[in-house]
A protein has these predicted regions:
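Conserved G/P- and acidic residue-centered "switch" motifs that form tight phosphate/ATP-binding loops
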Residues: 142, 285, 310
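Membrane transport/envelope proteins' first extracytoplasmic loop
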Residues: 1-260, 269, 328
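Short coil/turn motifs that cap or connect alpha-helices
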Residues: 140, 287-288, 370
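Juxtamembrane/interface segments at transmembrane-helix termini
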Residues: 39, 43-47, 359-372
Length: 415
């Protein structure tokens, strides 16, 4: 009998355990990598878009209007970007878009900018349209849409920096069939006969928001002020990536530890049940290092194979999760999934390392015993569980209680 042949027979004997171990390891590694990578992708995609297209830090309304000179003076004095903003809600009451509300913006110049996809900037009689609404109504670039008194040719699709999360009202919900954003040039905007909702958008280049607000309230009297952190259209997508990452860092390690502990416990028990073989190996002249190395191989298979499978399957899973969050929760954004390297390294290395370390420690402890005790299988430590020793309860009840309380580690992991 060679030590290598014995390893092969042991794996065949416990093949179901190794298959389950590989599956559990793969699932755990897959979830860790996919969840962390999805969170990082969401955060990067949204923050990059918000930064590139200059989403506001706050919006406010004042009782006294700001003139262009006032805006320029405040920008120079406080190092801020300030812009008058406004929109007109057009309720469509006929045609294919009957019942929809279209929020029309004039093209912004400084803040809350927009991207242009699959087309060009709007000119006379043209408009940009948010893509989720367009997809819901099968509207293509080049098609013409009617808003009652006015018709526009869709020149391109767009996403506006302050409307990534497409809410008509802050307390409402997303309805891609009934609400959309359009962006037209100033001349087309002025032609629309609808009430304008006006406000000011501001972006701070340094940490002086309190000082600026104090000045605004003193000179113009602030009627309302809403920071971007409380603006659901901006804060929801910005925070969702962090929320996914936080959930991944909280729950994935717990699952990881539970699965690893279960597998390590079973591997350790398998070695204990075969301790007579350790005595045989010693008698055959194998060194302790060779014996430990032999048993370490038992941890390599589920660790390496499971981790590799888990990391490979995490690639398509990350793509699916990104699609779920970005394409179903947010207005259309151009993105490419990014994979978190530290989580990949952890998923590849940690399971194998822990499996092998646990087995090596267990084998090392057993090898400290006398070879004769190992051969006779008397090297196994036993202890008497004295729980309910003097109780008059039925023996069956005593045994059940002792099986739980007498093995606290196993019971905790099972729970």
């Amino acid at each position: 009998m060679t030590i290598n042949k014995r390893a092969g027979r042991s794996v065949k004997k416990n093949i179901s355990f190794y298959i389950i171990s590989i599956i559990l390891t793969a699932i755990t590694s897959m979830i860790i990598v996919a969840a962390v990578s999805t969170g990082r992708t969401l955060t990067k995609v949204v923050r990059d878009f918000v930064d590139e297209y200059k989403a506001e830090d706050a919006e406010f309304v004042t009782y006294k209007p700001l003139t262009n000179d006032d805006i320029e003076k405040l920008e120079n004095e406080y190092d801020v970007i300030l812009e008058y903003s406004g929109y007109k809600d057009v309720k469509v009451e006929s045609g294919d878009l009957d019942g929809a509300t279209i929020r029309v913006f004039a093209k912004p110049e400084k803040l809350n900018l927009y991207d242009v996809r699959d087309g060009h900037e709007p000119g006379d009689g043209e408009t940009l349209l948010t893509q989720d609404f367009a997809d819901a109504h099968n509207i293509k670039v080049g098609d013409e849409i009617s808003l009652g008194d006015h018709s526009y040719k869709v020149s391109a699709y767009t996403t506006k920096a302050d409307y990534i999360y497409m809410l008509q009202t802050f307390t409402g919900f997303i309805d891609n069939e009934k609400f959309a954003v359009m962006i037209v040039d100033r001349q087309e905007y002025d032609k629309i006969d609808a009430e304008e909702t006006a406000y000011y958008s501001i972006k701070y280049n340094k940490d002086n928001s309190k000082e600026v607000r104090k000045r605004l309230n003193k000179d113009y009297v602030i009627a309302s002020y809403m920071a971007a952190t409380t603006n659901t259209r901006i804060s929801m997508p910005v925070n969702e990536g962090d929320a996914v990452s936080n959930m991944a860092t909280m729950f994935a390690p717990v699952m990881f530890i539970i699965v690893l502990t279960l597998i390590v416990m079973v591997l350790g028990r398998n070695i204990k049940s075969e301790q007579y073989l350790l005595g045989t190996f010693i008698s055959l002249g194998f060194s302790r290092k060779q014996i430990v190395g032999h048993y370490v191989r038992y941890g390599l298979m589920p660790g390496v194979i499971g981790s590799v499978i888990g990391v490979l399957t995490s690639i398509p899973l990350t793509g699916l999760l990104c699609t779920f969050y970005i394409e179903y929760d947010f207005e259309t954004l151009i993105y490419k999934p990014t994979y978190n390297i530290p989580s990949i390294i952890t998923a590849l290395v940690l399971p194998t390392l822990l499996y092998c370390a646990a087995i090596a420690i267990q084998a090392g402890r057993l090898l400290k015993k006398a070879p004769v005790d190992l051969l006779r299988n008397t090297g196994k430590e036993t202890k008497t569980i004295g729980i309910m020793k003097d109780s008059h309860a039925k023996t069956q009840i005593k045994m059940r209680v002792r099986s739980v309380i007498g093995h606290p580690g196993r019971s905790i992991v099972t729970i």
